[in-house]
Structures are given as structure tokens and as C-alpha cells.
């Protein structure tokens, strides 16, 4: 789901909201979340999950062009941990045979193929058996 799809869903769910107002609402929420993470805070949305930061320690890397050793500084990266309710809902959807294709992604169209037309590398049968497709 893209941000614009989320805006459209919000506007459809609340008809009193203009599309412009739904867009402003979504942007405001995302900006607040981004700012909180940038300030080093943790975000918890009960039933959905939490956003936090993981620290990556400094390390020595290599410049791929020259092969020269380069010091890569410490950095913080955003991390999402799904909450129990979200994990259970996703698992229930997968085990009931709907909503996901075999590679762990939601299908893009009615055929279950991605927008590029590639076929899923695996499929899950109703009996729980996994079928891997080799190319």
C-alpha cells in the first residue's frame, strides 16, 4: 500500500473528510513519527507494532572501486517490530490461504503475479504443503 492509497482509504472511510484533508492528516502523522525517531524516541502503536532505532557500530569497509579501506561511522537505522495482534492477523490470513503469495508479499493483481509479471517462486496449498517453483 502506498501513501496515496492510504490517503484514499482514509477519505473513503470518513466521507466528511476532503481528500486534501486526508492527505494532510496522513502527512502530519508520518512527519510526527519521523521526527520522533530522528530525536531518538520509540513509537508504540498498541495492536500494530513499535518503531525504534537500532545502532550499527562503526566498521571498516572497502571502497568497491579502489579497494581502499574506509572507516564507516556508527549509524542509527529505523526498525519496526510487529505487535502480537498484527502478527496473528497476518498469520491467520496466510494460513487461511488468502492475502499472500508464496514469497511473503501480497499479490499485486488478481492473478497473484507482481506488476513485472514474474511468477511467485513458491505456493502454499490448502493442506499446508509448500510447493517451490524452480526456474
UniProtKB/Swiss-Prot annotation:
A GO term for molecular function: structural constituent of chromatin
UniProt xrefs under PANTHER family: DNA-BINDING PROTEIN HU, INTEGRATION HOST FACTOR SUBUNIT BETA
Bias (Basic and acidic residues) ranges: 83-92
Polar residues bias: start-end ranges: 111-122
SUPFAM superfamilies: IHF-like DNA-binding proteins
HAMAP family tied to this protein: IHF_beta (MF_00381)
SMART domains in the record: BHL
Descriptive protein name: Integration host factor subunit beta
Keyword Transcription attached: yes
Gene designation: ihfB
CDD domains attached to this UniProt entry: IHF_B
Domain of life: Bacteria
One GO term of the biological process aspect: DNA recombination
InterPro entries listed in its UniProt record: Hist_DNA-bd, IHF-like_DNA-bd_dom_sf, IHF_beta
Entry GO CC: chromosome; cytosol
Keyword Zinc found: no
Location of the region described as Disordered in the Swiss-Prot/TrEMBL record: 83-135
Entry keywords, A to Z: DNA recombination, DNA-binding, Transcription, Transcription regulation, Translation regulation
Record family assignment: Belongs to the bacterial histone-like protein family.
Function: This protein is one of the two subunits of integration host factor, a specific DNA-binding protein that functions in genetic recombination as well as in transcriptional and translational control.
Provenance organism: Cupriavidus metallidurans (strain ATCC 43123 / DSM 2839 / NBRC 102507 / CH34)
Residue ranges the record marks as coiled coil: none
Subunit structure: Heterodimer of an alpha and a beta chain.
Amino acid at each position: 500500500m502506498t501513501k496515496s492509497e492510504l490517503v484514499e482509504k482514509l477519505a473513503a472511510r470518513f466521507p466528511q473528510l476532503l481528500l486534501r484533508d486526508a492527505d494532510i492528516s496522513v502527512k502530519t502523522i508520518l512527519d510526527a513519527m519521523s521526527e520522533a525517531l530522528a530525536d531518538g524516541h520509540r513509537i508504540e502503536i498498541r495492536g500494530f507494532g513499535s518503531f525504534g532505532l537500532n545502532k550499527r557500530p562503526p566498521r571498516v569497509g572497502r571502497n568497491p572501486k579502489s579497494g581502499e579501506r574506509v572507516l564507516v561511522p556508527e549509524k542509527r537505522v529505523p526498525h519496526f517490530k510487529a505487535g502480537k495482534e498484527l502478527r496473528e492477523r497476518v498469520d491467520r490470513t496466510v494460513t487461511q490461504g488468502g492475502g499472500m503469495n508464496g514469497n511473503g508479499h501480497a499479490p499485486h493483481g488478481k492473478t497473484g503475479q507482481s506488476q513485472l509479471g514474474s511468477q511467485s517462486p513458491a505456493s502454499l496449498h490448502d493442506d499446508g504443503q509448500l510447493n517451490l517453483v524452480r526456474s
